[in-house]
Amino acid sequence: CLVGSEMCIRDSGNYKRIIAFEPNAKNFEKLKLHCKGMANVSLWQLGSYSKNTELIFNNKAGRNSAIADKGIATKVATVDTILCGMAAGYIKADVEGADFETLIGMQKTMESCKPKLNFSAYHRFEDIFRLALYIHSVNPDYKIFLRHHPYIPAWDTNLYCI
């Protein structure tokens, strides 16, 4: 798991290593509690992006914290930088609209080890096409699926790539 959520962490079961990013301080504390006592878990209080930098986050949105004009300065890094050549088997990302930038920042990982991907495709209307086209351009061996989940509220539409 990478860029993990509570459910991803809780349901991981048999894993070699979990690496999770969470830029929001309050959510990061919750993540630490959920992972307490788990082996081989690395938690990073930062966001994922196309480059290593600092961005402004609106943390007032709680679970939906996102890049904004006003807010808190937050460190972000590429997945490739954090993994530093380590293989990844599965990457789940719900990065509130920074999905395309996160994919750019993990290009080497997608090329070298083709991890299974689970990315949100509903934050920006163009993401349904843009994300799939980019993933295919980086590694045409991916099979790409789109699934809409019947949750309430009903906006969870994800790309699954295997």
Which positions does each model-derived feature cover?
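Conserved SAM-binding motif I beta-strand of class I
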Residues: R17-E22
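Short internal loop-to-helix segment that lines adenine-nucleotide cofactor pockets
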Residues: K51-I56, A61-C113, S137
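Short, conserved active-site loop motifs that form the nucleotide-linked donor/cofactor pocket
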Residues: V41-S42
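A short, conserved beta-to-alpha structural element at the edge of catalytic cores
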Residues: K114-R130
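Single conserved hydrophobic/aromatic residue that forms the stacking wall/gate
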Residues: C1-G4, C8-I9
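Conserved SAM/SAH-binding beta-strand->alpha-helix loop
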Residues: N24, Y49
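Binuclear metal-ion centers of metallo-dependent hydrolases, dominated by the metallo-beta-lactamase
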Residues: I128-I162
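Conserved SAM-binding loop
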Residues: L31-K32
